[in-house]
Amino acid sequence: MNDTTSVKEQHPISLLTVATIMCAVLYAIGAYSTAYIPSPWGVGQFRPAVVIPAFFAVIFGPMPAAVGAAIGTLIADSVKHGYLYPGSFLAAVPGNFIGFFLFGYIVKKKFTWGRFILASNVTLTVANLIVAFLYITVFKVLYLSQPAYVALSWDAIVFLSVGLTIWWFVTMLPFVLIITPLLIRAVAAAFPSVVPKDVRTHSLKEELPKITFSLAMLVPGLIMLLIGLATTFTVVGNYISSNFGPPIPTLIELMFYASGVVLFVLGILIYTGQKFIWHSSLKEKIEK
């Protein structure tokens, strides 16, 4: 798609404003619905609602998704804690804004499902790493000066930040790669005038070979299994036990194995049964 076509298909400001508000509200509701499911690290939450700003990034571009995600996460965190939560605007807000701006930027000029996979991996890595590092260092250590976190060495803080990033990544990736495409294609079929032309006309079967999509699950799954084995049979497990008290070491080990198995199985299922996940009738509706 050339630049001229892109300009012609720009959404009006009024629609982008409405999209931003919708993204923020839906993301806040979705994030709050799982706000009380914690990570095995003791901080952070289970958040499959990231499919919402990912969807808005594809349909409406970087800014509605970024602003909507930032506002939505602040609302959800503040409602959970009962006040304007400093940990959210110090960590979650900048992480969500940067992450979903990157998502929208990557897929904006030319959408393909390959770029969608790239955007998903970049966003979930960068955004979660920003949130994890800022939440631990800026909020827990510098802002609150909580003894349990102040006592951690810098290598333990980095380890915890990376570990929290991994947790978020492996629990968000399946939802983004499976549910978001379904939402995109459903909206493209129901409201084609709102969806950019390149998004509307591309189909999963044409743009995303099943082996590519499967590898997007299989590779992280294999990595998680290998990390789990390293946790069990190498000094990594001893390091976790010496820096983080029970039951965190056991939960972390279980996290690596469970997420590895789930991602690996999903990758196999997608490869062997893709037509049952993305039905061809949706493709036909979009092409019409």
Where would I find each of the regions flagged by the language model?
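Loop-helix junctions at membrane interfaces
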Residues: 1-288
